Structures are given as C-alpha cells and as structure tokens.
C-alpha cells in the first residue's frame, strides 16, 4: 500500500511538472507603452472562469465588491464603450470566450481618458468555424432578486453577429441607526447588437447598437426627520456606433474612423435631464522611417448638449488632435504622446433673471503621456508618467443645484499628474507584479488630492488549483477649500481569490476583498466575501450556488445601503450552452 501511495504522489508531481513546463513560454501580461494586455489564453481558463475572475488578476484593484467595476474604469468591447449592466455582464461572459483584455491606466492620449479614468477594453475570440452558439443563464436569490441573461453569436466566413439581452430585478430592505424603514426595487433591462463584417481582406466594418432601461423606486423613513421619502428614478439610454478600418499596406499602416451618437433621458424625483452626445474621430497608424517606430495620428470632434430641465443647459464643442509615438527595439519599449484639445463651452440658465450665470468660454488644454519599459527574460521594469488637464463632467456640477455661486467660474480646467514605476516577473505558472505610484490632482473648488502608494499582486496556477492575491496600500492627503486643516488617510485594500477544480465537474471558488476605509469620509471598513460552487451536467448545463456577504456594512447613509445590502444573499442559478 505504501509503495502504491508513493507511486501516486510521484505521478501527480510529474503531471504538475509537465503542466508547468508546457506553460513555460506563456506570458499572461504584455506591455504596449500606455497600457498592458492580459493574454487570457495564457491563464488556461476553465469553462466557468468569468470575466470578473480575469479582472481580479489585474495588479490594480478594479473591483471592491466582486461584482462591479470601480467607477474610475470605463468598460469597452472592441475599443467601443459597452453599455450593459456590469454585474450581469462580468459574471456571465466566460474567460474561454475572450482573446485578450487591454487595461489603460495611462490612456490620456490614445483613449482620451484625461487622467481621471482608465479603460478596460475586451476582445473576443474569433469563431473557429461558421455557425451559431450562445448561452442562456437564469438565477434567483434572497429578497426575491432574479436575473435572466442570454447571448447569441452567429458567424459566417466574413460576418460575425453577436447579440446580448438581459433583465435584472432586485428588491431590498434594511434597518440602520438612522433609517428604521428602507425598501427599494431596481429593474434593469439591456439589449445589445453588434456586427463585424470583413468586407475584404483589408477592409472591416463594425456596427453596434445599445439600449438600456433603468427603473428604481425607494421608500424610506428617516428617524431624525420623522418623514417618509419616496425617490423614483427612471432612465433610458440609447447608443449607436459605426466604425470602419482599412489596412493601407503590408508595412502595418492602417486607417480607422468611428461615428457615434448617445442619448439619455433621466428622471430622478423632480429632476429631469436630457443629454445628447454625438462624436466622431479619424485615426492613422503607420511606421515612421523604420518598423520599430510606430506613429498614431488622430483627430476627434465631440458635441455635448446637456439639459437640466427648468434649471440649466450647458453645451460643449471639443476639437481634439492627438499624436503618439511608440518605439520598440530589443528589450526597450518607449512611448510618448500628446493630445491637444480646443473646447468651447456655453451655459444658460432657464431663469431669465439669472444673466450672471450665463457663461461662454473657449480654452486650449492638452494631455501628455510617456512611458519607458525594459524587458530581460522574465523580468520587466516600466515607468509611466502623464500630465493632464481635464474638465469636470456635467453631472458633477450641474446636478448640484445649490452651487450657483461656483458655476459662474465654470468651467475651469483642472490638473492631474500620474506617475508609476512597476516591476513584473513572469515564470511558468507564476506572475508577480509590484509598483509604486503617485498622483496629484487639483480642481476649481473641490479637494486638492495627493496620493502615494504601493501595490503588489501574485497569480499562481497549478492546474487544478489557482490563487490570486494582492494588496494596495496608499496615503492620501486632502486639502479642501474652506478648511484650514488637511485631511490625512492611510488606506489598504486586500484581495484573495482561490479556485479549486474537483472531479466529476465540481468547481469551488471564493473571493475575499477587504478595505479599511470605503471612502475618505471615514466610513468603516468592510470585508466582502463570497463562496461559489459550480457543477457541470454534461457539456451544456452548469448549475451553481453562490453565497455572498459583507462584514462591517456601513449605516451612515442610505446611499451606502443601496450599494451594499444586496450582497447579503444566497444565489442559485444555471447556465445552458447551445
């Protein structure tokens, strides 16, 4: 018996060694100047690994609750904004469907993200053969919550058509020190259509259309005021995108152009908002003197017509010209770029007597970005820097109805500096990253913010067992207009995500996310934790149970209740593939 046991252990060790050797040449991360790429296939995903599981591998913390992407990142698919219910989308899109994910933390020039926001750009695998495939997912959980999700992909030799549809219903109730009665209902409906057509070996046309409906009703009783509050929210959003690209020659020269139109209709209590936002851009990519030096040149025009009915109307017209150079030779990768923006802004009050609040401004601003990377074998060192002037978004200012006194000075360009030094080590089935970063931000009347921090992450894949862990520690210094004293905060975020593949189609996974402060307003710490068990029944059906909880749920504001109490739930669902 002892000899048989030793033989089994040796056999398992040999199999693990073979796996590690087979993965030796796979690199999960590759760096391309202003962004890094997650090569999803190099993660060797199992059939139930989701898009959110892949995003947990990111060195940056892209989620704090295991469900949604943090607000500083915009989700795109094929470099086009993707307007879907994030929670439903990230948990139902499987990693095996994806080719790669581009993460832009310094995308001010190429993506126009102005230093405040990053971009998560998802690319799907090309269908291996013409045909139709898809899946249907349904789930239900406590509080009467439920979701229905479906996606279908149809492909021929030159055309790929993909469609999504989902509906999500959430109920909630809670009691806190400030609120003795709180009930809410949220309904989300999404529909998405995309078409990719290879007109010729050098020409491609992509068309996308999105529709989103959101309805939210809240009933609460505030103890201090002894009042009942009813806050209905209604939102409808539409989006249409057309994108054309053409390969100009065999040296890598390419031209692409995109046109888009967005429409928003929002009712929040007595507040009514209308927003139309068309834009278009044209972009060239080509080698300059040598194939090692690639150049990108582009022009973009945006128009935003934003109405707060009965209060204010503001309009933007922006012309942007941008250029970026990327030099890649041997172990070196150097990127430098600049985006110049000339914008015109008009603000009009609906009250004829408020002439002092009518403004018209014209300004020139620019964003600068550079990075240097050096790679030797499995080691990579990269430094990135960006200096941006950005504009506050419309809703940051004009939804604050009491801020008329500040609006007469609006808009004022704001400054943000970002810099980061990062080290990455990739070997066989282990990926490790560490970075030091610093940012400085100043705006018209909100806090001046300085942040310095250190983050590290590790991903280990041993075949049947996968582990992702990370930590992010940073110090924040705030200087608020009107306050003599500065606000100092030391914050830490931790993540741990193990996955175990068992026999007979069982999969057990867990996600734990901790942060000692949910915001700089000293809200208490919390720990999000989930345990999920999947079971395959044949090749088409998967059934799962998922329990989620939050320890240390805050009770300071209703807003935090809205965002957090949904987690305390047991979810049972199934996915059928066809």
Q: What is each model feature region?
A:
Residues 23-24, 533-578:
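C-terminal beta-signal and adjacent terminal beta-strands/loops
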Residues 51-54, 88-89, 103, 113-137, ...:
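N-terminal periplasmic accessory domains that precede
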Residues 80-107, 150:
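Short acidic/polar hinge/loop motifs at secondary-structure boundaries
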Residues 127-154, 179-184:
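Short strand-turn segments of transmembrane beta-barrel domains in outer membranes
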Residues 170-190, 196-279, 403-404:
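Flexible loop and strand-edge segments within Gram-negative outer membrane beta-barrel domains
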Residues 230-247, 356-375, 379-461, 487-490, ...:
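Outer-membrane beta-barrel signature, preferentially recognizing the C-terminal barrel domain
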Residues 292-376, 380, 391-392:
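Signature of Gram-negative outer-membrane beta-barrel scaffolds
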Residues 331, 426-518:
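Gram-negative outer-membrane beta-barrel transporters
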């Amino acid at each position: 018996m002892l000899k048989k046991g030793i033989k089994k252990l040796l056999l398992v060790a040999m199999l693990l060694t073979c796996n590690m050797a087979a993965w030796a040449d796979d690199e999960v991360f590759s760096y391309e100047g202003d962004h890094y790429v997650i090569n999803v296939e190099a993660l060797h995903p199992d059939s139930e690994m989701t898009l959110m599981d892949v995003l947990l591998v990111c060195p940056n913390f892209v989620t704090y609750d295991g469900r949604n992407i943090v607000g500083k990142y915009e989700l795109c698919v094929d470099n086009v904004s993707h307007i879907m219910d994030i929670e439903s989308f990230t948990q139902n899109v499987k990693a095996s469907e994806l080719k790669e994910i581009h993460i832009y933390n310094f995308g001010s020039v190429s993506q126009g993200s102005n230093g405040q926001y990053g971009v998560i750009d998802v690319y799907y695998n090309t269908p291996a053969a013409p045909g139709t495939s898809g899946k249907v997912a349904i789930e239900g959980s406590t509080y009467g919550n439920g979701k229905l999700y479906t996606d279908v992909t149809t492909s021929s030799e030159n055309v790929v058509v993909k469609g999504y549809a989902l509906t999500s219903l959430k109920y909630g109730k809670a009691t806190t020190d400030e609120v003795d009665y709180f009930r809410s209902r949220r309904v989300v409906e999404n529909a998405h259509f995309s078409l990719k057509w290879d007109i010729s070996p050098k020409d491609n046309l992509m068309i996308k259309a999105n529709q989103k409906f959101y309805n939210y009703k809240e009933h609460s009783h505030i103890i201090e005021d002894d009042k009942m509050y009813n806050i209905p929210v209604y939102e409808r959003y539409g989006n249409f995108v057309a994108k054309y690209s053409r390969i100009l020659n065999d040296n890598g020269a390419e031209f692409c152009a995109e046109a888009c139109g967005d429409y928003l209709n929002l009712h929040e209590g007595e507040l009514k908002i209308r927003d139309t936002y068309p834009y278009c851009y044209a972009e060239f990519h080509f080698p300059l003197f040598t194939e090692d030096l690639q150049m990108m040149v582009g022009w973009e025009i945006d128009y935003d017509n934003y109405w707060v009915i009965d209060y204010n109307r503001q309009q933007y017209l922006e012309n942007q010209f941008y250029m970026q150079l990327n030099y890649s030779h041997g172990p070196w990768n150097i990127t430098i770029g600049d985006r110049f923006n000339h914008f015109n802004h008009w603000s009009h009050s609906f009250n004829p007597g408020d002439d002092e609040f009518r403004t018209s401004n014209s300004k020139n601003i620019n964003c600068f970005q550079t990075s240097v990377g050096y790679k030797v074998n499995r080691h990579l060192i990269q430094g990135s820097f960006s200096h941006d002037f950005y504009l506050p978004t419309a809703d940051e200012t004009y939804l604050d109805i009491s801020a008329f006194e500040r609006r007469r000075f609006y808009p004022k360009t704001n400054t943000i500096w970002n810099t980061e030094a990062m080290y990455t080590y990739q070997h066989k089935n282990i990926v490790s990253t560490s970075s030091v970063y610093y940012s400085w931000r100043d705006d018209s009347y909100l806090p001046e913010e300085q942040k310095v921090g250190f983050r590290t992450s590790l991903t280990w894949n041993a075949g049947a067992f996968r582990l992702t862990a990370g930590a992010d520690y940073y110090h924040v210094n705030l200087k608020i207009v009107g306050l003599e004293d500065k606000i100092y905060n030391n914050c830490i975020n931790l993540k741990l995500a193990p996955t175990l593949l068992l026999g007979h189609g069982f999969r057990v996974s867990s996600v734990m996310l901790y942060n000692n402060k949910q915001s700089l307003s000293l809200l208490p710490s919390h720990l999000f934790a989930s345990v999920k068990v999947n079971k395959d029944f044949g090749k088409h059906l998967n059934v799962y149970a998922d329990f989620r909880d939050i320890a240390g749920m805050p009770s300071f504001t209703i807003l935090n209740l809205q965002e957090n109490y949904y987690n305390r739930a047991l979810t049972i669902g199934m996915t059928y593939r066809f």
